[in-house]
UniProtKB/Swiss-Prot annotation:
This is Superoxide dismutase 1 copper chaperone. Copper chaperone for apo superoxide dismutase 1 (SOD1). Binds copper ions and delivers them specifically to apo-SOD1. The keyword Zinc applies. Binds 2 copper ions per subunit. It holds the Pfam family HMA. Disulfide bonds join 27-64. Belongs to the CCS1 family. It comes from Saccharomyces cerevisiae (strain ATCC 204508 / S288c). Zn(2+) binds at residue 16. Residues 6-69 form the HMA domain.
Length: 249
């Protein structure tokens, strides 16, 4: 990423005083690409202007013993997300089993440039995985029902780190860009596969391990200030606990 790829993102993070703010600043001070940090202690919100992947911000804070939830990124109608699930059944661990294998956070930073923060966790084979966007958002039959490849990413996702979901499982992450506006992505499917050929809707092409999800709009910066979900009645931190339990990180 370049300095021209900067965008603003807001994060919910527990803080109660200036000492909390100073601890957060110290935690993030060595992360390259952060231009500015601003804090609202009363609302427990941190605003970050940077060219850094949201997952990097969140993971860095977690390594310092703090948690954070991204609340919004980019301008209105410029952000999206896809929760990536496998349609191939196997058990990881009875206590940790989940269909989720990854997450793609998406934010547009220019008229024709969008960033993709991709995390993968719990894949059964170490190695390079490959991302693509398919023309349809029908995931009822896995990759087979998503149609043709609409855009493919040439850079691989390197998954060689041990996963926290169980033995012989692997994780990885990457931060990619594409010359696409976010509005063209909504409703399509985001697919990650072990296959370099980016499998399409042919049964013979989905033998390689793959996982996918529908791309949905997400909040822009300052568009989401809810503290309690109207659907579940849970606080954002209770929902965060549920998300982590389902491998949404």
């Amino acid at each position: 990423m370049t300095t021209n790829d900067t965008y603003e993102a807001t994060y919910a993070i527990p803080m109660h005083c200036e000492n909390c703010v100073n601890d957060i600043k110290a935690c993030l001070k060595n992360v390259p690409g952060i231009n500015s940090l601003n804090f609202d202690i009363e609302q427990q919100i941190m605003s970050v202007e940077s060219s850094v992947a949201p997952s990097t911000i969140i993971n860095t804070l977690r390594n310092c013993g703090k948690d954070a939830i991204i609340r919004g990124a980019g301008k209105p109608n410029s952000s999206a997300v896809a929760i990536l699930e496998t349609f191939q059944k196997y058990t990881i661990d009875q206590k940790k089993d989940t269909a989720v294998r990854g997450l793609a956070r998406i934010v547009q930073v220019g008229e024709n440039k969008t960033l993709f923060d991709i995390t993968v966790n719990g894949v059964p084979e170490a190695g390079n995985y490959h991302a693509s966007i398919h023309e349809k958002g029908d995931v009822s039959k896995g990759v087979e029902s998503t149609g043709k490849v609409w855009h493919k990413f040439d850079e691989p996702i390197e998954c060689f780190n041990e996963s926290d979901l169980g033995k012989n499982l692997y994780s990885g992450k990457t931060f990619l860009s594409a010359p696409l506006p976010t509005w063209q992505l909504i409703g399509r499917s985001f697919v990650i596969s072990k296959s370099l050929n980016h499998p399409e809707n042919e049964p013979s092409s989905v033998k390689d391990y793959s996982f996918l999800g529908v791309i949905a709009r997400s909040a822009g910066v300052w568009e989401n200030n809810k503290q309690v979900c109207a659907c579940t009645g849970k606080t954002v931190w209770e929902e965060r606990k549920d998300a982590l339990a389902n491998n949404i990180k």
